[in-house]
């Protein structure tokens, strides 16, 4: 192998290793910020990872909203019409949050039937439903 070819091969291998390292770092950083979506049925089945930031979506069950006498703590149940989980949240709820409303909550699973939310998102107009919730609920209705 000539010195010129050897140098070109070395430069190519070095550039490839630098690009691979950069891609690995980007993928690692993205993995830390991923917030996966689960339904109440998947959480009850134990498919959602514990101590990992996730999203859960469904409909707020009727007569399930319990507000604390003092403070902003609230507890409610969400359902996908197959299973129900209890969500606890401490903070200001969206103005459009109510029973029978489609919501997405972000937070962590505490056990198979309880979810601690750090953020609650409600629909913003009469025709909107989060795409993940809509498809998950449509799948449950078809079954």
UniProtKB/Swiss-Prot annotation:
This is Cytochrome c-type biogenesis protein CcmE. It comes from the Bacteria. GO terms for biological process: cytochrome complex assembly. Belongs to the CcmE/CycJ family. It comes from Legionella pneumophila (strain Lens). InterPro entries: CcmE (IPR004329), CcmE-like_sf (IPR036127), NA-bd_OB-fold (IPR012340). Keywords: Cell inner membrane, Cell membrane, Cytochrome c-type biogenesis, Heme, Iron, Membrane, Metal-binding, Signal-anchor, Transmembrane, Transmembrane helix. Residues 30-143 are periplasmic. Heme binds at residues 124, 128. Residues 1-8 are cytoplasmic. It holds the Pfam family CcmE. GO terms for molecular function: heme binding; metal ion binding. Its main location: membrane. It is found in: Cell inner membrane. It is a single-pass type II membrane protein. GO terms for cellular component: plasma membrane. The gene is ccmE. The chain crosses the membrane at residues 9-29. PANTHER family: CYTOCHROME C-TYPE BIOGENESIS PROTEIN CCME HOMOLOG, MITOCHONDRIAL. Heme chaperone required for the biogenesis of c-type cytochromes. Transiently binds heme delivered by CcmC and transfers the heme to apo-cytochromes in a process facilitated by CcmF and CcmH.
